[in-house]
Amino acid sequence: MNPKALCSFLLATFLLLTVTIMPSVHANAEANADAIIGPCPKKPIGIVC
């Protein structure tokens, strides 16, 4: 593998991981905030706050 291809591969992998991991991290942070502060009132019905 030449360095340019390797760099592209690593960048693509990083972006994929970011897109995959960030929403779950965000959901966990929101759940933790709800546990500390209390449920947020402005969520649509059907979404567990």
From Swiss-Prot:
Tissue specificity note: Expressed by the venom gland.
Gene Ontology, cellular component aspect: extracellular region
UniProtKB keywords: Disulfide bond, Secreted, Signal
Propeptide positions: 28-35
Processing after translation: Contains 1 disulfide bond.
Compartment(s): Secreted
Signal sequence, renumbered to the chain: 1-27
Family: Belongs to the formicidae venom precursor-01 superfamily.
Protein name: U6-myrmicitoxin-Mri1a
Record organism: Manica rubida
Organismal lineage: Eukaryota, Metazoa, Ecdysozoa, Arthropoda, Hexapoda
